[in-house]
A protein has these predicted regions:
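Nucleotide-sugar donor-binding/catalytic module of glycosyltransferases
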Residues: 1-162
Length: 162
């Protein structure tokens, strides 16, 4: 496996209904550089674990699964996957999220490579609430600006960067 320029950080716990779409959106990325997908599987009790290991078997040059022996919780899972990432850059896509743009990694990496004075890029996203079926479009509603409270971009209001 080539050293990746970008590591896609994905944590998951009981995301069986969503995990395939999350992984497929990463695998569909069109890039001119190598990237990896590092999945932190935290002892899911549904079929998530089997799904991520199946993908890892089918895409061994791209996907690495770091599986818990016992549930460690979201924070510890998040941190250990950061440490497992080997890329110069880290992109986040949680196991119940997905990207719409198949060139997301290429665009963001091109920007960072051509602007070494920047250390973070993010993109707007829609939030979908499964229980109500409601979507909040353009959650950040900013262009080329850091929101007033940039730490909330990282936290994603409880979700992580998208």
């Amino acid at each position: 496996m080539q050293t990746p320029l970008v590591s896609v950080h994905m944590i998951t716990y009981n995301h069986e209904p969503y995990i395939r779409k999350a992984i497929d959106c990463v695998l569909s990325q069109k890039t001119n550089f190598p990237f990896e997908l590092v999945i932190g599987e935290d002892c899911s009790t549904d079929g998530t674990r089997e799904i991520v290991f199946d993908y890892a078997r089918r895409f061994p040059d791209i996907i690495r699964v770091i599986a818990s022996d016992q549930n460690v919780g979201m924070k510890k899972n998040f941190v250990r996957i950061i440490h497992a990432c080997r890329g110069k850059y880290i992109a986040y896509c949680e196991g119940d999220d997905h990207w719409h743009d198949s060139e997301k990694l290429q665009k963001q990496t091109d920007f960072l490579e051509s602007h070494p004075d920047y250390g973070l890029v993010y993109s707007d996203h829609n939030r979908y609430f499964e229980k109500t079926g409601k979507t909040i479009p353009r959650f950040y509603q900013t262009t080329n600006q850091i929101p007033p409270d940039p730490i909330n971009v990282f936290r994603g209001w409880g979700k992580g960067l998208h």
